[in-house]
Amino acid sequence: MSRDLRGRGCPRGRGFQGWRGGWRGGWRGGWRGGWRGRTQKVEWKRAPEPASSRLVQSTLDQFIPYKGWKLYFSEAYADKSPFVQKTQAFEKFFMQRIELYDKDEIERKGSILVDYKELIEDRELTKSIPNISTELRDMPQKILQCMGLAIHQVLTKDLERHAAELQVQEGLPLDGEPIINVPLIHARLYNYEPLTQLKNVRANCYGKYIALRGTVVRVSNIKPLCTKLAFVCGTCGDVQSVPLPDGKYTLPTKCLVPECRGRSFTPDRSSPLTATVDWQSVKVQELMSDDQREAGRIPRTIECELVQDLVDSCVPGDVVTITGVVKVSSTEEGASKNKNDKCVFLLYIEANSVSNSKGQKTKNFEEETFQRSFMEFSLKDLYAVQEIQAEENLFRIIVNSLCPAIYGHEIVKAGLALALFGGCQKFVDDKNRIPVRGDPHVLIVGDPGLGKSQMLQAVCNVAPRGVYVCGNTSTSSGLTVTLSRDGASGDFALEAGALVLGDQGICGIDEFDKMGSQHQALLEAMEQQSISLAKAGIVCSLPARTSIVAAANPVGGHYNKAKTVSENLKMGSALLSRFDLVFILLDTPNEDHDHLLSEHVMAIRAGKQAVCSSAVVSRTNVQDRSVLEVVSDRPLLERLKISPGENFDAIPHQLLRKYVGYARQYVHPHLSPEAAQVLQEFYLELRKQNQGASSTPITTRQLESLIRLTEARSRLELREKCTKEDAEDVIEIMKYSMLGTYSDEFGKLDFERSQHGSGMSNRSQAKRFVSALSSIAERTYSNLFDLQQLRQVAKELQIRVFDFESFIESLNDQGYLLKKGSRLYQLQTM
């Protein structure tokens, strides 16, 4: 029994040996002999095709009216196919507009821009394809292929017509057909509606055509993606081209030669049958508006793949509108760790068109219309902008609408409003000149509890593009640019920080004094309006054309007027000098002001309409006449105030955001001669008063700041020319800012105090004091002084300081005095 079993079926039986021997001897020998003989004597011959099939195939090729059918569709041509009917409808649509397109540009780029609104508004097209929007959304690949084939056919016919005309002109015979070879052309739709929010991109969107808007936060390197790959059969050497959909590597299943049974294939990347395209991946983060903000949720991101002419169409920080098809990819990293993850997929978008919000000027008119601004205005919005502009005292209305919850501080709000509108950047396109920034920077310094952070958040909220960060929780790379390694490919990619994301907008930085070493990262961004990066072999520069609005608390919790701004904040002069306006907010007790403030707070808490009236303590000393004092009949502060009992209707932030966006986009003011003269006189007067000072805080930066703010004041009222009144308003705001900076502890204006000066506020007094101590030490042969002796010396020299111990501490910090004991100091200048 066992022998029979072994002989019949077991591996070690004779039957198996005989079968194996027969296989080895007969089949292998015959195969080898036949193969060797054929290779030496006879060439491979394909099986003869019947004449009928050859006739049918040639007839099909001859009678297909579309020469590029095989470029777009894999199925055979049929007259009654619905795709043929759609292609004919699109062909009529493009034939009417062929003269509007640049044919050479279309052939060079391999794509054509099609306005979606024109498609759905064309009567003939909607009559032929009634539900075109639904079909485009549900089966985008086929509709886009029909559009591509239609424009391919239109260009082919156009070229044939031109070739025939040339033949007639040259007098050539019209017997032969000209060879017309139009490449594959993609139809790229823009202005597609509706826009899909990123949170709604779920599994039910798979395979659908959608449009979404967001900020580019990461851009990968450009790589070649193989769309068709040639494979060589290892048996017969026949070459076949295999399409690779979505870039997924697939091997051919069998050889195309009927007699060959080969199953091993090697890819031939250098074959003319291999086709590659440029490929790039970008990560897009959703744009958060008021009604879409969700507390505690990280902004959603999605990967988008760009191919061919779409690569390099955006950089980190750009606001883009991407239309494309939602597709899925498997999680390759997770698949190796857990087998269950093979069923988990990631959604990504295969981009069909990218509309960049930069609005850059391009040579091609099509591209210029394509690269729209990131703010779109409906007819209702434009009417609202017109209504706002027609208001009387518009500056007063906008200033008081900026942050109605905060009481008073009209001049500070006016400075923030000017930063919101911004000036005009000069020499942007001129490669031979250095660009001059147009965005003003504002710093608010003051005691805690005066509403600095709320004003900052209000400005970022009103800005069309605002980023709000807190200084003590942000890093320097989080503010500028991060270089991250891509997990899948291992390449380095740029990730934009707060300043790059706030490009052409506002970046609000709260707790500015607690940033530590991150201050140095802001220096280049604040003046050059760009961020340079040199890390891991990548050297590049990213735009950061943003206005920085910062709020800071002084060291010690209370602003000490005996010290300069630099000493109060422990901040370098290089950074402070880049701020156009520095406002000092002091919590000074005033009975009338406190009474109105308490009424305002109680009204807000009770839910009533806020009382917007204000009373501001005068900070100008009457005894000290200076160029900084306001001598106008009706100063700006009086004009900005809301009188008690007045019913003030503030502009809603949503509407104000549209107004600011419209002004920044379409209004580009320039200085009139009268305004320029007013600014020049004020600047020269400041320089004249400052001549005798030991330090010179007034530089050309202050003059540039005045020009920027004057342009912003004109832009606020949608005027193209800056008037004399604009310049006078800006000068009053600048005076208010400088009064806080240059006032000493006694309320007097001291031009020896530099707002960004380092060291002692009272330099001349410190020099006299140290020289007196040096002469005493030489006379007594002792350089040790106790605190009582130091007080006596200061009294004899009539040195008046607000806090004597702080005065001595500052001398200790600067190295003039060395503390030897509890109340003992050693002079170090001997």
Swiss-Prot record:
It comes from the Eukaryota. It catalyses: ATP + H2O = ADP + phosphate + H(+). InterPro entries: AAA+_ATPase (IPR003593), MCM (IPR031327), MCM8/REC_WHD (IPR056875), MCM_dom (IPR001208), MCM_lid (IPR041562), MCM_OB (IPR033762), NA-bd_OB-fold (IPR012340), P-loop_NTPase (IPR027417). PROSITE patterns: MCM_2. SUPFAM superfamilies: Nucleic acid-binding proteins (SSF50249), P-loop containing nucleoside triphosphate hydrolases (SSF52540). Residues 394-601 form the MCM domain. It is found in: Nucleus. ATP binds at residues 446-453. Component of the MCM8-MCM9 complex, which forms a hexamer composed of MCM8 and MCM9. Belongs to the MCM family. This is DNA helicase MCM8. The gene is MCM8.
